Amino acid sequence: MIQPIYIFLLVALVVSVTIAMLVLPNILLISHKKKLFDMPDKRKVHHAPVPRLGGLSFFPVMLITMGGLVLIYHLMGLSSGSMHGEVPYEFLALLVGSMMLFLVGLADDLIGVGYKKKFLVQIVAASLLVASGVWIKSLDGLFGIYQLSPWVGMPFTVLIVVYVTNAINLIDGIDGLASGLCAISLVALAGLHIWLHLFSFALLCITALGVIIPFWFYNVFGNAMRGRKFFMGDSGSLSLGYIISFLMIHLSTVDVSPHVVSDYNMVFAFTTMLVPLLDVVRVVGHRLRNRQNPFLPDKSHIHHKLLRCGLRVRQVMVAICLLSLMFILLNFLMIGHVNITYILGIDIAVWIVFHLVLDVILHTRRAEMDI
């Protein structure tokens, strides 16, 4: 017989999708009435004005869905053995931090906010998680490092939260890419949290996934000329990145014997977002090498590179999502058999080879165009 908690999680997904489907058309209507558009320019891929407030639905819908369903679940007396007893402080910190990033992202979408101010808010939001007890206490043997002192682990966690949040924000450059990668990550994280019987965290994954699904269809299949297309905007990417970073860090530090996945929780958690994490390192390195401001946008991301190889936007989105799935499968197969440091080394080697292949393709295309 299926346990009530699994039915509850399925209901949560349906409710989240349904509420998002009801909210998104209204945001779209308001965006067009108020002319709240992301205008095309030489750096951007789209060629028509598109509303950038799709992410406006993310945090409120998640809050309503998760809060409402948890209340109903407890009123029905179903809390025993599933979500009962889990400490709420980390969720309160997540709530406040998500609200902060949602608001600064919304302000950036509407009037523009400088990157320095956004970084400051991200650091404060990340510090809230650390203050609630969610911080990386061990590297699980990465580079031979295990336990971290609070003086190292706490600031390191703040850095990781800011890193993950911005990685998702920066990869949001073509239709369906950021939302697709986040959806893949959330499915994987939800699965592992369910396996570990951490149902409150699985619920968070599933409600976030439920919001992303209808947005993804608007973003990928919507017609901008007919007013049926959305972009995520910073209100969506920043709050979503923050929530995913929270889930990844929590999974990296949890100890729930006998369901524990040994020292490889961190590997699995960060593998789910490996493509954006590796891409932002390469992009920042490229900008510094060319003496450019690493915080200002350009066209050096992986999706720009694939577009220059001749792929269409949707093909690029599918290719990068498949690459993310490949990393997840590869690392999952290596877990328990390969040292964590070697896993990271293999991932980086695969990433480098992938870009070397793209460079060869680009060089060949340029040579053909010069003939």
Language model features: what each stretch is:
Residues I2-K35, M62-L75, G81-H84, P88, ...:
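Alpha-helical transmembrane segments
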Residues M39-L53, R228-G233:
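Juxtamembrane helix-capping/reentrant segments at transmembrane boundaries
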Residues A48-P51, M83-L92, G144-M154, A269:
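Short aromatic-rich membrane-water interface segments that cap or initiate transmembrane helices
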Residues P51-L71, S127-A131:
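A generic, lipid-embedded transmembrane alpha helix
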Residues T65-S82, F102-V113, A131-F143, S252:
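Transmembrane alpha-helix boundary signature
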Residues S82-V124, L129:
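Hydrophobic alpha-helical hairpins/lids featuring a short glycine-rich hinge
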Residues P155-T165, L177-A178:
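Function-critical hydrophobic alpha-helical transmembrane segments in multi-pass membrane proteins
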